[in-house]
């Protein structure tokens, strides 16, 4: 079945309204495709992008969320609501425990949270609480990576969830605050029944609006690829009981002599052996944070020089006794 007669957008206009807002206009689409793609991208943007949020809090002198704390203007419920407004971003890890300790008269902001080199606070001026003279606030904040909105009562927690003084928070992980789309009429030569898709997006600053749309598009492509390959099968590396695995596949990815950026991206995804790498698809690798098309092309070229490709399948991998690296 041929589909090359369908129009694809030839005009793509990206307007950066602010560092956290953008408007993307694409045209022309065949009639109906504007709503089809616009709605799919909107739903993915709102629900499926990874982000970071406070998930648990322990406050010195507080037993539960309905307590009050002497010297703090806000009650604990309001303080927790303010805390959930702090936008954070973790680099090279999926969770962290942070501390906020401040005393004396003044305003407590996100800037007062003690962070390491791999934790970034996007809105450091966000107000968390107000302290009166003699007031003191000392808390431990657990930050985790996740997707969408996850109520605290359904999120699995490590250890004893009944620990006195630990408050489990409802977590809004999504870095996208608002997204809407509009479909307008477009024209190409004599055709006037075409669609123009306009997407307005606002993020919390943890992710660039354009990158958010690119990520959502990759997620959609990855999901649709299942339908495109209904009758196809991925190449399989045949392994018989009498055969041993190609020694090349047992070598660490460091032997490929990739750039430091590419090598670090692979290790962050627990890809330590060449055998691990060749089983990943291009789509899967492009979802890796900080790994772009340039790094992907580098990986493909290095593998091709060894007679290997991405998207291969290995039976009985990993082999018994393979040492875990990392």
UniProtKB/Swiss-Prot annotation:
Keyword Transcription attributed: yes
Domain of life: Bacteria
Lineage, highest ranks first: Bacteria, Pseudomonadati, Pseudomonadota, Betaproteobacteria, Rhodocyclales
Entry domain remark: The N-terminal domain is essential for RNAP assembly and basal transcription, whereas the C-terminal domain is involved in interaction with transcriptional regulators and with upstream promoter elements.
Region (Alpha C-terminal domain (alpha-CTD)): 245-326
UniProt KW Ligase keyword: no
Record-linked SMART domains: RPOLD (SM00662)
Name the record gives this protein: DNA-directed RNA polymerase subunit alpha
UniProt GO MF annotations: DNA binding; DNA-directed RNA polymerase activity; protein dimerization activity
Sorted UniProt keywords: DNA-directed RNA polymerase, Nucleotidyltransferase, Transcription, Transferase
Gene expressing this chain: rpoA
UniProt family annotation: Belongs to the RNA polymerase alpha chain family.
Signal peptide start and end residues: none
UniProt-listed InterPro entries: DNA-dir_RNA_pol_insert, DNA-dir_RNA_pol_RpoA/D/Rpb3, DNA-dir_RpoA, RBP11-like, RNAP_asu_C, RNApol_insert_sf
Chain positions covered by the region annotation Alpha N-terminal domain (alpha-NTD): 1-231
Enzyme Commission numbers on file: 2.7.7.6
Function, as annotated: DNA-dependent RNA polymerase catalyzes the transcription of DNA into RNA using the four ribonucleoside triphosphates as substrates.
């Amino acid at each position: 079945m041929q589909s090359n007669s369908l129009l694809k957008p030839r005009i793509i206009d990206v307007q950066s309204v602010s560092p956290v807002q953008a408007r993307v206009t694409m045209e022309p689409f065949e009639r109906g495709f504007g709503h089809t793609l616009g709605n799919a991208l909107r739903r993915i943007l709102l629900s499926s992008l990874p982000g970071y949020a406070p998930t648990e809090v322990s406050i010195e002198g507080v037993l539960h969320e309905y307590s009050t704390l002497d010297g703090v203007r806000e009650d604990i419920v309001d303080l927790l609501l303010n805390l959930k407004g702090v936008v954070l971003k973790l680099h090279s890890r999926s969770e962290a425990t942070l501390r906020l300790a401040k005393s004396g008269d003044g305003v407590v902001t996100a800037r007062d949270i003690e962070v390491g080199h791999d934790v970034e606070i996007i809105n450091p001026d966000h107000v968390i609480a107000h302290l009166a003279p003699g007031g003191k606030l000392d808390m431990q904040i657990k930050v985790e990576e996740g997707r969408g909105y996850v109520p605290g009562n359904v999120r699995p927690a490590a250890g004893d969830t009944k620990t006195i003084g630990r408050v489990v928070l409802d977590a809004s992980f999504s870095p996208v605050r608002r997204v809407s789309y509009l479909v307008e009429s477009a024209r190409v030569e004599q055709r006037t029944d075409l669609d123009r898709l306009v997407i307005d997006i606002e993020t919390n600053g943890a992710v660039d609006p354009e990158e958010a749309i690119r990520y959502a598009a990759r997620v959609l492509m990855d999901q649709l690829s299942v339908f495109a390959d209904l009758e196809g099968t991925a190449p399989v590396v045949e392994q018989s009981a009498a055969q041993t695995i190609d020694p090349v596949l047992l070598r660490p990815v460091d032997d490929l002599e990739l750039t430091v950026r590419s090598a670090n991206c692979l290790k962050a995804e627990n890809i330590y052996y060449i055998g691990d790498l060749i089983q990943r698809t291009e789509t899967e690798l492009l979802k890796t944070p900080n790994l772009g098309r340039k790094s992907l092309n580098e990986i493909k070229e290095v593998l091709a020089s060894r007679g290997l490709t991405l998207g291969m399948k290995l039976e009985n991998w990993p082999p018994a006794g393979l040492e875990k690296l990392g």
